[in-house]
Structure formats: structure tokens, C-alpha cells
């Protein structure tokens, strides 16, 4: 069973957590070419392309200009610090947790494509609609689709053919998602709040649950999809009367 989790815009600058090993991103070369190109942009262009403030644009210009400083590298699972990662709590993982995650978790990234948790990466900011000379003018969604679709399918098939989809739907566009769903069994847990007359998905809760469920799978060494039904978080519980086999619902009353 493989897990797919989205990267986050917010990133850490350092970590003191020990990890059992370090690995290299599969698409380090492509990421380096992108970083080299972005390091030549001015802050105004970065603001426009990354849809961010001047301060964030300046911070990321500096990041891209120091992209080859190995002292700034972090394991991907500890580099991100968005809402999902606050609930993943990887800084509390044991060495065995990290080892299990390395074999079972993929993290999507606009800059690096697809990462394993212990791949060493540099902090960055990127958007999927950015077009670069290095991509021959394609946006990153289109560029990565050619690389990542087969990679993900082959990795899932090499395991047990099951993918737990805990990434945001935006990142599906990095793949030929229709083909992924045809070739492997994709299970996408969904998280809702019961509003009485309807159920509603609230982004912050969904992100929290995705991170917490990833942690739950890793720390409990889960290898059967039905075992995720035991997941609970702050009132979110499996609701068997909702959804279906491929879209299990977890609802907070």
C-alpha cells in the first residue's frame, strides 16, 4: 500500500531530527535546472508567477540563488510545515517510522516532481501553472505528467496495487490521473463536517485529517485499506453509510 500526500507552501529552514538515512530526489537534475532559471528572475516576476507577496518573492529568490548550498538541505517529510504536516508530526517519528514512510509514502512537489520522505531537498516556493524555458514553455502540470504517471503506477503495482490518495485534488494534474485510476486501485478518504441538513468539507479540517491519517498509517504499519476505518481525529470518524469503497467518508458530527 502506497500513500500520496501533497507538499506544502510553508517550509521549515532547519531541523534537528535524526533520520535513519538520506536519499536523493529522483528528479534532482530537473529541479536544479528550474532553480537556476528562477534564480535569474526579479522579485516582480516571482510575485506574479508565484502569486505571492513581495516579501515571499524576495525570500524565494534568495532560496533559489542559494539552491546548491548543501547545508540548507532537509528531508522532505521534515521540510514542509503546512497544515497537513502539523498533524503528520514527523518530528516525533521513530527511526522505524521513517523507514516505513520511506517505503510507503510519496510527496508531490511542483519543483521536485515526486519525493520520498527522506529525499534531501532545498526550501522553495513553486506553482503548477508556472512556465519555464527548461520545460520548453509547458506549465509544470503538463511537464511532470510525462515523468510521474508511469513512476507512480509502477511503484504502486510493485507493492500491492493500492494507493491511498491523501493529496489535494490540485496535485492530480501532475499525473494522467485517469490512467492512474485505471491501472491501480485508488482509495481517496474524504473528510466532512455534519451541518445537520448536509455534510460539508472544510479545507483546514481536511488538511489536518490527511496529515493525521498519513501518520496513523505509518505508525500502525497499516497494509490493509480496511484498517484505515479505525482512524479518528477530533470527532472525525468513519461513516459506513456514506461514500463507497473507493471514497470512504470520515464525518464529524
What are these regions (language model features)?
Residues 1-2, 179:
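C-terminal accessory regions
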